Structures are given as C-alpha cells and as structure tokens.
C-alpha cells in the first residue's frame, strides 16, 4: 500500500512539473502567439487506469503556470481524433488548438467576463453536413436542416458551456460540428465529441476566462 501511494505521489508530481512543457511545440501555432490563457485537455494513464484532465494555465511574465488545480473531464465516447481526422458523427473529440470566444447557458447571465449567449427553446446547432447552416447556431424558424441539436436540453448538459471554435472558420462540410466544453452527465460518462466536466468546474473555468487574454483550448497535445 505504501509503495502504491508513493507511485501515485510521484506520478502526480511529474504531471505538475511537466504540464506546461507540453505547450512548447505549440508556441508558434496560429492562435497561440497572443494567448494568455490555455485550457490543456489531456489523457493520463497510470497502471490500468486512464483518466482525462483539464489544466487551466495562464501566462505570467512569459511563463506558463497552473492557474487552478487540474479538473476531471470526459471526452468523446470513441476517444480523441488525431488532428485533421475528426468527422461528423464519429463520437471522437478533435485534437488540436482552438480558440474560445463565446460562453453560453440557460440563465439570462453567467458569472463570466466572456461574451455570453443565453440559449432559448428555439436555439439549434445544425449538424446536417448538407445544410448551408452546418455547424452554426440558428433559430428553429430560420432553418430547414434535416438534423440539428437543441441547445436548451432537458438534461442540463448545456446549462453552462463555452463554444470550442472547431471547424467554425471556415466551416468544412462533414468535419464535425457542435464541439463545446460543457457540463458532464457524470464522471463515468462520455460525450458525442465534446469535452465535459462537472458544473462546479465549468463555472470555475467561466469565471477565470478573460477575453482580453485570448483564451484557447489545447486538446490532446501529445498527438503528433
């Protein structure tokens, strides 16, 4: 038992001391040059266990430092998609670096500095690759899309969240849609391709994010 505890402690220390180093290969990536905040989403394996974590990192005096303790997270039911391989409906979370611009939720306002959009009953996110509004937020009376996702759900998974700017500019048909950071269904749940965490942690993230610091999310940074 003591040996196991020591190994767990060592693993935790290693994660703390190397997490910022994982940003180094992305230092010149588009979107990273002006970023002052990063959400680093990783998978971590120890013995026979694999978990996913979100590390909130902030740049201080040109150095990346952890802004908060790492948070438990869940991802797509089929894991991460390597860069460029995400496809509509594949159940995978896209790997890569993406901007964070707009928060959303059910209440009229949220405790965040980010631009915020209240989601109403008729708000839809189009996931029909053949529709001209693919991967766009639109009102129900403005679309004839064959497939879409209601943004005000009965299960409260979108009670609070933030849009991950994946495949949004430009939008490419079939490469995936509706990728968000949102509230999870539980620690043992999965998503259709989003990143999710507890409501408490999502609120912490929303309260921390600062649009003046050009926040981004880096998903699965160890994927070449």
Give residue spans per PLM region:
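Sec-dependent signal peptide recognition
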Residues: 1-4
């Amino acid at each position: 038992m003591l040996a196991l505890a020591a190994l767990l402690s060592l693993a935790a220390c290693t994660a703390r001391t190397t997490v910022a180093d994982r940003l180094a290969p992305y230092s010149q990536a588009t979107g990273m040059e002006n970023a002052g905040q990063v959400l680093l989403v990783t998978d971590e394996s120890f013995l026979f266990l694999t978990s996913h974590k979100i590390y909130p990192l902030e740049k201080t005096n040109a150095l990346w430092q952890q802004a908060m303790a790492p948070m438990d997270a869940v991802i797509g039911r089929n894991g991460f998609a390597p860069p460029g391989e995400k496809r509509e409906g594949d159940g995978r979370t896209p790997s890569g670096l993406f901007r964070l611009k707009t928060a959303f939720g059910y209440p009229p306002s949220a405790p965040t500095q980010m631009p915020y959009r209240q989601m109403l009953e008729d708000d839809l996110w189009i996931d029909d690759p053949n529709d001209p509004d693919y991967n766009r937020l639109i009102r129900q009376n403005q679309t004839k899309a064959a497939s879409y996702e209601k943004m005000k759900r009965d299960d409260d998974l979108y009670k609070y969240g933030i849009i991950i700017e994946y495949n949004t500019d430009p939008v490419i048909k079939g490469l995936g849609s509706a990728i968000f950071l949102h509230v999870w269904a539980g620690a043992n749940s999965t998503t259709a391709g989003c990143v999710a965490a507890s409501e408490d942690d999502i609120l912490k993230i929303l309260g921390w994010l600062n649009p003046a610091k050009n926040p981004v999310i880096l998903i699965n940074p160890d994927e070449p």
